[in-house]
Amino acid sequence: MQGPPGVGLADDHAVLRRVDGPAQCGLVGEGQVVHVHSAKALEARKGVLEFLLINHPLDCPICDQAGECGLQDYTFQEGRVDSRYREPKRFNPVEDFGGDVLYVTNRCILCTRCVRFMDDVHQEPVLCVSERGDRATIGKAADADLTQPWAANVIDLCPVGALTSKPFRYS
């Protein structure tokens, strides 16, 4: 996953560096040593994955992204079969983002690829992160929607199937 310099992506890339933190928030410098398979980095990734799965629905068999989902791949690599979290999962309704795009809030991991794509291509805010913390979701900017002819590209950018195509949903 690559993005513009200085842009952080989803927190599923924890590595051990001289200064601990998410790998995507720092640039690799000459002579820098990065340990991606150290015990500390693996433990950090396990923790991040557990948090990402707390409210993520277990609907992989019917998800349009099934078999091509980064989160599904990480979960299988991890060998995770259950969760320590016993509370009911939060349920949020599906939102219509306009055009052919639906937003399945429960699947979103807030990687912000869609937000950054729309900012870069449209040159003004169309999508944004609404709320904070565990209530954060992707939302539409005021008086904006995804009606531009190329806006449906955000569906392909979404790594977990949170953005789906109305005409091709569940097909």
Which residues fall in each region the model found?
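Fe-S ferredoxin-like electron-transfer domains
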Residues: 26-171
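Basic polycationic patches enriched in arginine
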Residues: 17-18
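Short linear motifs in low-complexity or flexible loops
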Residues: 4-5, 10, 14, 23
